[in-house]
Each structure stands twice: as structure tokens, then as C-alpha cells.
UniProtKB/Swiss-Prot annotation:
It comes from the Bacteria. This is Methionine--tRNA ligase. Its main location: cytoplasm. Is required not only for elongation of protein synthesis but also for the initiation of all mRNA translation through initiator tRNA(fMet) aminoacylation. Pfam families: Anticodon_3, tRNA-synt_1g, tRNA_bind. The keyword Phosphoprotein does not apply. Belongs to the class-I aminoacyl-tRNA synthetase family. MetG type 1 subfamily. Keywords: Aminoacyl-tRNA synthetase, ATP-binding, Cytoplasm, Ligase, Metal-binding, Nucleotide-binding, Protein biosynthesis, RNA-binding, tRNA-binding, Zinc. Its EC number is 6.1.1.10. It comes from Neisseria meningitidis serogroup B (strain ATCC BAA-335 / MC58). It is found in: Cytoplasm. GO terms for molecular function: ATP binding; metal ion binding; methionine-tRNA ligase activity; tRNA binding.
């Protein structure tokens, strides 16, 4: 039976470039979608740029252009990058669209009518010059505890104390430099706590399509933490409003109030699909009505599970729509075992990869070969990337066609022999459903291992039958024809198995094979007495120099981007000079993160269990806003001040040092990287 499926990837934010971390998710999604289409299902893949919020508004102001102009330009760049990697969206839209405005307002009205919206008066700091309320990270001032200057509105980077912006001494706006005022403002809250019973049932439930869980096991465990046990819930109501000026959609009947970006961003899935439906004549309501029998899957990063597994299903359900069939999260991408680094050139943008002339299908294959159905981080090891692509794709796969096609063209007028009874091909067709199940369940790594095992069998058959020797022997034409026809058929089957991962190679192979297109049926059916075309080379080897040039290009692009910022004086002024003796008092050491977790009762602190080599310590750091998924820091090397006096962190415990981080221009805190080879306890200086 033909399935009706809607699939989405998380929406990239419209203020930065697409990098390989983004590509992990979009490759994972695209492979699954292409597999469904190969099987003949009606599968629609929709995405969009996430365009609203303060960062976009301020970025456009810095460029001196309207936000609408900036997001239009960014969308073109994003779509070009994704298209370059053969991501086959059926629609790539924008959250700044009439459809999204209508859906956001309709959902809000439905939630309000259902008693799930409440207004409350809150206090916030206000910039009188810019006439805007200021988020925590847009307020700076003097730390109320250690009196360090120029500290952010949520925590002190010198002593680690956390506080509210209203506690800062002599606060000023990071946007205009003026002194902010404390003002009251009416905000609107989605009463998420009242949705707990539904969410407990949905998060622990199974979808009606195949009985599989809505969430992965790791995600479900996290939801249980957030939802609480029994009748109690730890869910907080969600502030869904922001004050003008704000780039976004105005809340109905609330002039000057705008939807927070995380309300209208997931609604963007609906808007993109509605835009597609109107163009191709699909019934939108069939997919989103409360009793829909269609399927809807969201592929996301593990850092946004909270929004997609709690807010989004609750918003949909209590506004009269269906909830997702499944939400599938993936881990983060590291490069050579470490977080992507701009200084090392491993923060690789999609654009730089394409501009350096690397084949995007090399990366599609390598990423897919690392992915499974679990929420696990994956590592791009650049040496392994070179060897795996060259060995698997060039050495094992395309080489099969190259070794057989010439004989078919020269000796048999380009026509195959009927080899339907081939034992070799029977081995390949026998794996069709098993490999299909691997794709279906997102076990891509296993699927590709099994496919390469079949390629090994085919290559063993080549070596055992030696068509190049058969071609020299009298009376062996029929056997040569049979062997080469088996090899071309085997190549066709392998191409069909690999088509979700290598769509462009599959399309080029279809031309060579004289087929309209490769489908999943090609994993089972032989070609018969079929005429093929002249073989054209399908894939080149990866060269070490190409990878070296890619890394160097990313280093240079970062340096070039940093230069104007320095010239324009965008960095904070350098603090007053310190003597050498002052510096030598600070004992900075490398430490390994054994465990990092959120601190119950604090929205700002993370608790680090650290190994300093010579001893283990606990340090609290106010960087929770920058690392919403603290477990991702486990195993990472950090730099910490080892001789900082222990300090009591309110009710949370004693912090035995201070972890160093950098404050970025967008108000985030980023931990400092430690280069390869450094060990816990090593002195920094």
C-alpha cells in the first residue's frame, strides 16, 4: 500500500552559513526521503529558513538593510548549499511567509480558546534609546559580587556568580550603551504544565503506522526527566511573546507584542507544506487534521528535543491538529575527534566544500556510513574519510562497471545476456528487504556495511572468473558474455541499494545502463537482453591535497571575516595592563570533562566533574544558555583556573575553580579548545 508521508528537517537560522554540522541532519533526512520515494511512496520533504528574532533584526541593522532583504539573500545562499549536496526538498520556504503568519495566529487563537494561553505582567530592563526590552545577554555592567566590569546580565565571567540583569551595578545596554530602565510588560504564556498528561502519554506512546515509538529511547528518558513522575510535573509555562521592536509576527489583538521565534518556527513546517500543497494539488488537511491517517516525521538535532517533543506536540494537539508520528534526533558532528574549530579550519562550511571542488557524494556517503537510529555524536575523521571513500566507492563499487562494460561494448555490441538464473545475483537480491529495513529504521551504517559486503562478493566473483583472461581465450565468448552481464546486473543492483545515498551517481549510472531511472525494483529484477550505453567514469578518488586545501581555505575565510571586525572596533576594549607577576599568579591547567549536567533549580549553571590529572574537582559555570545539551561536553578538554579560591554557589555546592570561555559577539559563551596531545593537568601559559 502506498504510504502518505510528510518529512521535515529542522529549519536553519537565517543569520549564518550552512556548515557540515547542518549537513549531517539534512543528509540523514534526504536519504530517508529518497528511500521512501524509491519504494513508491508519496513522501513530501519540506523545510524552510527560520527567519525571526532579535539576532536577525540586529544583524540586518548592522548591515544597513531591511530584515526582509537580508533573509531573502540568506535563503538563496542556504538553498544553493543544500542543492549542491543534492538535498532534494520538495519545498524550501521561509517562516516569514503569509502561510506561516496565518497558521501561527490560528494556532494561537485555538490555544487561547482552549484555555491554554495566559497573560502575566513581568519586569524587564528597557533600552530608552533603542526603545526595546533587552534580553539578558544584551545587558552589561558591574558584577554585584566581585565588581568586575563589563559583565553580561546573567553571569560574571570572572567569579562565576549568576544573577538577574536587574542585580548588575551600573548596567548599560549592549546595543546602544545607554542606561536601561526597569519597566513592566505584559507577556503571554502557553500553559505547558497543563499539557503534562497528554505529553506523558504521547512521549511514551507508539505510532499507529508500524507500532514503533514516537521517540527514541534516549529521548524518552530525557522527556521523563522533564515531565516528572506520577501526577507531578516539572514543566514550566512557556513565554511565547516578545515586545516591539522585534522581527516577527504580531500577536492577534495585542499591538506591539510579537510571537517568540520558537512559536512560529515549527509552524513553519506546516506553512512550507501548505505552500507545496497549493502548488501540486495535495490535500493539506488530510495531513494535519486531528484524526489524520498520514505519517509525519521530524528529523532534528538533539539540542532542540525540548521544543519538538514537548512544545510542538502540545501546540498541535491542543489547537486541534494531529501530533507527529515520530521525532528523530541525531547527535553532533566532531572533526578528528574534536568540536569543529574555526582556528583549526575544521569548521567547514558547505560552500567552501563545494567551492574547493570536492564531490558532495563523498561526504553524503561518509556521513551516512556513520549514522544509526541512536542519538550519538559522529566523528568526521579526515584520514578515514579519504580511505573509506576511495576503498568503498571507487575501489569496490564503481570499479565493477568499469571492469565489465568495455567487454560488453566491444565484443557484444553493447547488449547484455539474460542471466536471470545467476547464483551471484540471487545473493544480491536476497538482501533487498533486509537492507530496506535498515534504511526504514535509519540504520544507515548497517545498510552500507551490508551493501559493501555484497560488493566484496561481486569483486571476489570478478577475481575468480577473470573476464580479462576469458577475453583472450578461444571459445570463451559465451562465458565472457555471461560473466560481464552478471557484473553489470550486479552493479545495477548495488546502484539501487546506494541510490538514497548517492542520487547523482545513480542518475549517471541510469544513463549508462540505458534506464529511465533507478528504482528499488532494480534490487530484485535483472535486466534481461538489455542494451546499455558507453560507460563514462562515475567517480574520482579523493586526494589528500583536496582535503588539505579545504582545511586551509576555511582557516583563511575565518581570518578574512575577522579582519573587518577588528578594523571596525567591534571588540570590547582591552582591560588595563597587568604585570608579569600578576599573570604568573594564575595557574591555568588542562582538565578533562568527566561529566557535565544541568543544575536543578538554576537556569544558568552547569556542573562540571573535571579530571585535572593530579586530582578530580567540581566546578560550576554559568554557561547553560550556550550549551543546552550539557552531555555533549563529556570527554572534552577545557582550560580551567586551578588556584582560584573555592566559592560557595548558593544552595548548589562549592565550585573549586573557574573554567575559561570566550564571549562572542552574539552574546554567547564558548569554551576554549585544547589542541590535540594536551593531557589533563598540563599547565597553560
Amino acid at each position: 500500500m502506498t504510504r502518505k508521508i510528510l518529512v521535515t528537517s529542522a529549519l536553519p537560522y537565517a543569520n549564518g552559513s550552512i556548515h557540515l554540522g547542518h549537513m549531517v541532519e539534512h543528509i540523514q533526512t534526504d536519504v530517508w526521503v529518497r528511500f521512501q520515494k524509491l519504494r513508491g511512496h508519496a513522501c513530501h520533504y519540506c523545510c524552510a529558513d527560520d527567519t525571526h528574532g532579535t539576532p536577525v533584526m540586529l544583524a540586518a541593522q548592522k548591515q544597513g538593510i531591511a530584515p526582509e532583504d537580508m533573509i531573502a539573500k540568506v535563503r538563496e545562499e542556504h538553498l544553493a548549499d543544500f542543492t549542491g549536496f543534492f538535498i532534494g526538498y520538495d519545498n524550501y520556504y521561509s517562516t516569514h511567509s503569509p502561510e506561516n503568519k496565518q497558521f501561527s495566529q490560528d494556532i494561537y487563537r485555538a490555544l487561547k480558546a482552549n484555555g491554554k494561553i495566559e497573560s502575566r505582567v513581568i519586569e524587564q530592563l528597557f533600552d530608552p534609546e533603542k526603545q526595546m526590552f533587552l534580553p539578558d545577554r544584551f545587558v552589561k555592567g558591574e558584577c554585584p559580587k566581585c565588581h568586575a566590569q563589563d559583565q553580561y546580565g546573567d553571569n560574571c565571567e570572572v567569579c562565576g556568580t549568576t544573577y538577574s540583569p536587574t542585580e548588575l551595578i551600573n548596567p548599560y545596554s549592549a546595543v546602544s550603551g545607554t542606561k536601561p530602565e526597569l519597566r513592566e510588560s505584559e507577556h503571554f504564556f502557553f500553559k505547558l504544565g497543563e499539557c503534562a498528561d497528554f505529553l506523558k502519554a504521547w512521549t511514551s506512546g507508539n505510532n499507529p503506522h508500524d507500532g514503533k515509538p514516537h521517540l527514541q529511547a534516549e529521548a524518552l528518558n530525557k522527556m521523563k526527566e522533564w515531565l516528572g513522575e506520577g501526577e507531578e510535573t516539572t514543566l514550566s509555562d512557556w513565554d511565547i511573546s516578545r515586545d516591539a521592536p522585534y522581527f516577527g509576527f504580531e500577536i492577534p489583538d495585542a499591538p506591539g507584542k510579537y510571537f517568540y521565534v520558537w512559536l512560529d518556527a515549527p509552524v513553519g513546517y506546516m506553512a512550507s507544506f501548505k505552500n507545496l500543497c497549493d502548488r501540486i494539488g495535495v490535500d493539506f488537511d488530510e495531513y494535519f487534521k486531528a484524526d489524520s491517517q498520514t505519517e509525519m516525521y521530524h528529523f532534528i538535532g538533539k539540542d532542540i528535543l525540548y521544543f519538538h517533543a514537548l512544545f510542538w506536540p502540545a501546540m498541535l494537539h491542543f489547537s486541534g491538529h494531529r501530533a507527529p508520528t515520530g521525532v528523530y534526533a541525531h547527535g553532533f558532528l566532531t572533526v578528528d575527534g574534536q568540536k569543529m574549530s574555526k582556528s583549526r579550519g575544521t569548521f567547514i562550511t558547505a560552500k567552501s566544500y563545494l567551492e574547493q571542488g570536492l564531490n558532495p557524494e563523498w561526504m553524503r556517503y561518509y556521513i551516512a556510513a556513520k549514522l544509526n537510529s541512536k542519538i550519538e555524536d559522529i566523528d568526521l575523521n579526515l584520514q578515514d574519510f579519504i580511505s573509506r571513500v576511495n576503498s568503498d566507492l571507487v575501489g569496490k563499487y564503481v570499479n565493477i562497471a568499469a571492469r565489465a562494460s568495455g567487454f560488453i561494448a566491444k565484443r557484444f555490441e553493447g547488449r547484455l545476456k539474460d542471466v536471470a538464473d545467476s547464483e551471484l545475483l540471487a545473493k544480491l537480491t536476497a538482501q533487498s528487504e533486509a537492507i530496506a529495513e535498515c534504511y526504514e529504521s535509519r540504520e544507515y551504517a548497517k545498510a552500507l556495511r551490508d551493501i559493501m559486503a555484497l560488493a566484496d562478493i561481486v569483486n571476489e566473483y570478478v577475481d575468480a572468473n577473470k573476464p580479462w583472461e576469458l577475453a583472450k581465450q578461444e571459445g570463451q565468448d559465451e562465458r565472457l558474455h555471461e560473466v560481464c552481464s552478471e557484473l553489470i546486473n550486479a552493479f545495477t543492483m548495488l546502484t539501487a541499494y546506494l541510490a538514497p545515498v548517492l542520487p547523482q551517481t545513480a542518475a549517471n549510472a541510469a544513463k549508462f545502463l540505458n534506464l529511465e531511472a533507478i528504482t528499488w525494483a532494480n534490487t530484485r529484477d535483472t535486466l534481461g537482453k538489455h542494451a546499455i550505453n558507453k560507460y563514462e567514469h562515475l567517480m574520482q578518488r579523493v586526494e589528500q591535497k583536496q582535503v588539505d586545501d579545504l582545511i586551509e581555505a576555511n582557516k583563511q575565510s575565518i581570518a578574512a571575516a575577522a579582519a573587518p571586525a577588528a578594523e571596525e572596533g567591534k571588540y570590547e576594549k582591552v582591560a588595563e595592563q597587568a604585570s608579569f607577576d600578576d599573570f604568573m599568579k594564575i595557574d591555568m591547567r588542562v582538565a578533562k570533562v568527566l561529566n557535565c549536567e544541568a543544575v536543578e533549580g538554576s537556569t544558568k549553571l552547569l556542573k562540571f566533574d573535571l579530571d585535572f590529572g593530579f586530582e578530580k574537582r567540581i566546578i560550576f559555570s554559568g554557561i547553560a544558555a550556550s550549551y543546552p545539551n550539557p552531555a555533549e561536553l563529556n570527554g572534552r578538554m577545557v582550560i580551567a583556573v586551578a588556584n582560584f579560591a573555592p566559592r560557595k554557589m548558593a544552595k548548589f555546592g562549592v565550585s573549586e575553580g573557574m573554567i575559561l570561555s570566550a564571549a562572542t559577539a552574539d552574546g554567547k559563551l564558548k569554551l576554549l579548545d585544547v589542541d590535540t596531545g594536551a593531557q589533563p593537568g598540563d599547565k597553560v601559559g
